[in-house]
Amino acid sequence: MSNEVKKNEELIEKLVSVKRHSKTVKGGRIMSFAALTVVGDGKGRIGVGRGKSREVPAAIQKAMENAKKNMVSVNLNNDTLWYPVVSNHGASKVFMQPASAGTGIIAGGAMRSVFEAVGVHNVLAKTYGSTNPANVVRATIAGLAKIKSPDEIAEKRGLSVEEIQG
């Protein structure tokens, strides 16, 4: 369950979790492994993937390929967020807020992997409710995806950035 960090094609690949599954059949149990991975470019693109196989390396490889196919763009303010955001997925609820330079990533396991892969270096984050890694990762990515920059908000409201920021 440790994180694996590999630079491949300038992508940061993180292993979030590996679980063992078993299927009971007439002849006994069939074991398989499910992997959850996060892939990012460190510049605002992030993807999550799941893979399942009879062997751990094959499950991780499938999860990495799946994550690369499901990448989304995230709007960042240099190396932190624009404003605090709350998001949830299933019974997992995550709260993320920007932090000043030098703070680092103050977040739990699954969320930390997402922030490291997407390129956020200063953030404060907390998980409420379920800490299931799959739901926490999905909630974190959903929260990051719904963040808009002041430019986008100003354009949507028909105002200038100065009027919005006060």
UniProtKB/Swiss-Prot annotation:
Q: Which PROSITE patterns match?
A: RIBOSOMAL_S5 (PS00585), S5_DSRBD (PS50881)
One Pfam family per UniProt = Ribosomal_S5
For this UniProt record, the keywords arranged alphabetically read as follows: Ribonucleoprotein, Ribosomal protein, RNA-binding, rRNA-binding
Which InterPro entries does this UniProt record tie to the protein? Ribosomal_Su5_D2-typ_SF, Ribosomal_uS5, Ribosomal_uS5_bac-type, Ribosomal_uS5_C, Ribosomal_uS5_N, Ribosomal_uS5_N_CS, Ribsml_uS5_D2-typ_fold_subgr
**What are the annotated disulfide bridges?**
none
Q: Which GO terms describe its cellular component?
A: small ribosomal subunit
Top-rank taxon of the source lineage equals: Bacteria
Q: Which GO terms describe its biological process?
A: translation
Transmembrane stretches, by residue range? none
Please report the stretch or stretches of sequence annotated as the S5 DRBM domain: 11-74
User: Could you give a GO molecular-function term held by this entry?
Assistant: structural constituent of ribosome
Q: How does it assemble?
A: Part of the 30S ribosomal subunit. Contacts proteins S4 and S8.
Comment field on protein domains? The N-terminal domain interacts with the head of the 30S subunit; the C-terminal domain interacts with the body and contacts protein S4. The interaction surface between S4 and S5 is involved in control of translational fidelity.
Family membership noted in the UniProt record: Belongs to the universal ribosomal protein uS5 family.
Q: What does the UniProt function comment say about this protein?
A: With S4 and S12 plays an important role in translational accuracy.
Name of this chain's protein: Small ribosomal subunit protein uS5
Taxonomy, top ranks, is:
Bacteria, Pseudomonadati, Pseudomonadota, Gammaproteobacteria, Thiotrichales
